[in-house]
A protein has these predicted regions:
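Short, hinge-like loop/turn segments at secondary-structure boundaries
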Residues: 97-99, 121-123, 148-155
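Acidic, metal-coordinating catalytic cores used for nucleic-acid/nucleotide bond scission
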Residues: 66, 87, 107-117, 139-140
Length: 171
């Protein structure tokens, strides 16, 4: 059993679907449509068609659809998600073309999420995009954090998120 979510291109056309498992013990947490001529996971970001119009001068980059949906519901309309754990070079370049001043990496607080944050810093830097890293305590991901502590607490995390060098030095 999965919650199915449409994946849109920049113009708002549905190009694929993503499914998130409802059971925590499911073998694959997320499943996407097969790749096609119009849908390549490495070339797209979930909700970029909405976030590109945000008045915020940054994107919040996270891992999952539910994180993005939760953030948008809480008023963080610049949230986007990779269509896999880590950002790709193509996605980093796409972000760079969107005209935002920086990206706040808000990956899951587990080991793979933190590894993806380090990789993201490097790829975004190569694309000419400044990165900051949001670090959560008390929750595994942005969705859980917002549900437990609220939107104001998440806004404080965004404001206090450290630069890439601070993050790498603090590991």
């Amino acid at each position: 059993k999965r919650v199915m979510t449409p994946i849109f291109d920049l113009r708002g056309n549905i190009i694929a679907f993503g499914g998130r498992a409802l059971a925590s013990d499911a073998p694959a947490k997320y499943l996407n449509s097969s790749e096609t001529y119009v849908f390549q996971k490495r070339d797209n970001l979930f909700a970029l068609n909405y976030a590109k119009n945000s008045k915020a001068d940054y994107f919040i980059l996270c891992e999952g659809y539910m994180d993005v949906i939760s953030m948008h519901q809480a008023g963080f309309d610049s949230a986007v998600a990779t269509l896999g754990t880590a950002i790709t070079a193509t996605q980093a370049r796409l972000i760079g073309r969107m005209g935002k001043s920086e990206v706040i990496l808000s990956y899951d607080s587990d080991g793979p999420g933190q590894k993806a944050a380090s990789r993201g810093i490097n790829l975004l830097s190569e694309a000419g995009v400044k990165a900051r890293v949001l670090q959560m305590t008390g929750a595994k991901d942005p969705d859980e954090y917002i549900k437990k502590f609220g939107a104001q607490a998440f806004a404080h995390l965004i404001e206090s998120s450290g630069g890439a060098i601070d993050y790498e030095m603090g590991k």
